[in-house]
């Protein structure tokens, strides 16, 4: 079985990691832990006043944070899952919803797991919902894990 676990380092994402870690997956399953990172704002003419290395340094910092997020999830899974489960980590630059869907399709995932931030209507309108986009457009099963109160 191929399981794609999308993480972003948030408490909701941590809940999805814990959900994956507590399940008895079929022997030989592969869990791919994916995180996407992107600049919080596109470079605009106003940004030209910033130092030349600003966006490069920001990209390096975002990559480091993404790597730490993936590594932390993999360590949690390694500690709790059967040794027959294969673990892989990937960090990709770009919008999360697109990258999750593209990776799931190209890898032929059987299941995608994502955490839900539980945004209300106004927040969803402003920020968008990665989990909603994945549920709506994925070609495989999707599980949205909610943070327990």
What is each of the regions a protein language model found here?
Residues 32-34, 88-92, 143-145:
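General small-molecule cofactor/ligand-binding pocket signal
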Residues 35, 115-117, 147:
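Short secondary-structure boundary segments
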Residues 53-68:
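A short acidic, glycine-rich active-site loop
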Residues 111-133:
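Glycine-rich, Arg-bearing micro-motifs that act as flexible, cationic patches
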């Amino acid at each position: 079985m191929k399981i794609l676990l999308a993480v972003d380092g948030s408490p909701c994402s941590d809940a999805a990691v814990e959900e994956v870690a507590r399940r008895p997956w079929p022997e030989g399953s592969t869990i791919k832990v994916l995180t996407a990172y992107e600049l919080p704002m596109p470079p605009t003419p106003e940004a030209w006043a910033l130092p030349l290395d600003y966006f490069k340094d920001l990209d390096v910092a975002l990559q480091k944070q993404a790597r730490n997020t993936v590594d932390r999830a993999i360590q949690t899974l390694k500690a709790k899952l059967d040794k027959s489960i294969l673990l892989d980590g990937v960090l990709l630059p770009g919008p999360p919803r697109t990258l999750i869907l593209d990776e799931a399709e190209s890898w032929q995932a059987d299941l995608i797991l994502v955490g839900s931030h539980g945004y209300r209507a106004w927040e969803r309108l402003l920020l968008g919902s990665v989990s909603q986009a994945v549920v709506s457009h994925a070609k495989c099963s999707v599980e949205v894990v909610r943070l327990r109160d």
